[in-house]
Regions:
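Short, conserved beta-strand segments of beta-strand-rich sandwich/propeller modules, principally
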Residues: 106, 168-170
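Beta-strand signatures of extracellular beta-sandwich domains
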Residues: 125-129, 170
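Short beta-strand-plus-loop segments that form exposed binding edges in beta-rich domains
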Residues: 172-179
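Terminal (often C-terminal
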Residues: 41-120, 130, 139-141, 182-201
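Solvent-exposed serine/threonine-rich low-complexity stretches and specific carbohydrate-binding patches
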Residues: 136-146
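Short, surface-exposed tryptophan/glycine-enriched loops
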Residues: 148-168
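Self-maturation zones of extracellular/virion spikes and adhesins
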Residues: 2, 59-62, 121-123, 149-150
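Fibrous stalk/shaft segments of extracellular and virion attachment machinery
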Residues: 1-48
Length: 201
């Protein structure tokens, strides 16, 4: 079958048409606006999952001990039209967080400490698992408390959640002195974790 090169076709003369066997380099010029078309296999735009869970109850910490934060978590109230998650949102059980969909996530752990004695560095940790069993620390941060006072410490990491059944996270803190607390609240974020899906895995 012979091929004919078409230089110009008036838009008013084409009702329906198919372009077959033509490389993208053969197409040039401005394309008309598409209205009422159904396009498939296009990447989704914007952030599809974002959530916050906060710690609700101020709690004293045991000196020289790493503590897993396994209770007193809640999602902020959505009824006041101020906070709203994006997408399905995270699930939490005994401090273990399950992701709603696969993807690359930015996970942040923000802890507000209060202390009444000098401290070495209080630490915070993000732990992750790839088998729903063994956890390893993927992010750690620390701050120095001096006498009576408060401080906020932040740790963060990108996580590749290729499997929502086995890849999960949890959060820990460490007190380097006596009389240390992490502050919780049920009406605002003081100690909390954020989860934002950035891209496909």
């Amino acid at each position: 079958m012979s091929q004919t090169e078409v230089q110009l076709i008036k838009s008013s003369s084409v009702v329906d048409g198919d372009i077959v066997g033509m490389s993208s380099s053969k197409l040039s010029g401005a394309l008309p606006a598409i209205s009422g078309a159904s396009l498939t296999n296009l990447p989704a735009g914007g952030i599809t999952q974002a959530d916050i869970f906060r710690f609700t109850t101020s709690t004293g910490l045991t000196y020289d001990t790493v503590t897993v934060i396994d209770s007193n978590w809640e999602r902020p109230d959505e009824s006041d039209d101020v906070f709203d998650k994006i997408g399905t949102g995270m699930s939490e059980s005994s401090g273990i967080f399950t992701f709603p969909a696969t993807g690359i996530y930015l996970v942040q752990w923000i802890v507000r400490f209060y202390g009444t004695s000098n401290s070495n560095a209080n630490h915070i940790y993000i732990d992750a698992t790839v088998n729903n069993s063994t956890y390893v620390t993927v992010a750690q941060s620390a701050g120095l408390m001096s006498g009576n006072g408060q401080m906020t410490v932040i740790a963060q990491s990108f996580l590749d959640i290729s499997d929502t059944t086995n890849r999960k996270v949890r959060f820990k803190v460490y007190a380097a002195a006596n009389n240390q607390q992490i502050l919780g609240n049920t009406s605002k974020q003081e100690t909390y974790a954020t989860f934002i899906r950035l891209a496909d895995t």
